[in-house]
Amino acid sequence: MTPLGALLALVGLALIAIPVYRAFASERPTSGSPDAASPPADEALKQAVGAIDKKQFSLPAAAARYAKAIARAEATYGMPPGLLARQLDIESDHFAADVISGERKSRAGAIGIAQFMPATAAELGVDPTDPFASIDAAGRYMRSLYNRFGDWGAALAAYNWGEGRVLLHGAGAAPPETKQYVALILGAIG
C-alpha cells in the first residue's frame, strides 16, 4: 500500500470510529453486549471527537407519519435514538413519496423506505413497499448487524455495502460512499 493509500485508509477509519465513539461515549454497555469488553477510547480520539461540531438532525415534515414507528423500532431493537431515523432519511431520499412507494428504485434495484434489495426483503419476510413493516424490519436487521459486527458503524457499513463485503474486507475497507453514509448517520446523532 502506498503512503497516500495508507493515509486515506486511516482517514476512512476515523470517519467511522469518531462518530461511533460519539454515539456510545455516554452509554454504559451491559455485560454480554459487544461493547462490554471494549477498552475506553484513548485521549487522542477523545480530543478528535471534541473538535467535531455536532450536527443537529430532525426528521423532515414528510416523515411525520412515520416518526412513532421509527421511535418504536429504535426502542425495540436497542438502537441509539435517532440512528434509524437518520438512516431512513438518507435511504428514502428524505422520505420522498415515490421512493417509499417503490415507484422509484435505486440504481442497484433497492426498494422502499429502507431501500431493501429484493433478496434482503425476502430474507426479512417484508414487503419493501410497506413503510411501517419496513421500518420495523430495518430496525431488526440493524440490530442483527450490530450483534454480528459489534458496533453501529460497522453495522451501517454492512447495511450499505453488504454483509459479505464487510465480513471479507472489514468496514474500514468500505468505499468512500459507504464511509460517507456511516459518517452522515452517526455524525447526525452524535
Task: Indicate residue ranges for each PLM-predicted region.
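Single-pass alpha-helical membrane anchors
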Residues: 1-29
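General helical secondary-structure elements
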Residues: 18, 42, 82-83
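Ser/Thr/Pro/Gly-rich low-complexity linker/stalk segments immediately outside membranes or between
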Residues: 25-44
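Catalytic glycan-binding domains that act on GlcNAc-containing polysaccharides
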Residues: 32, 50-190
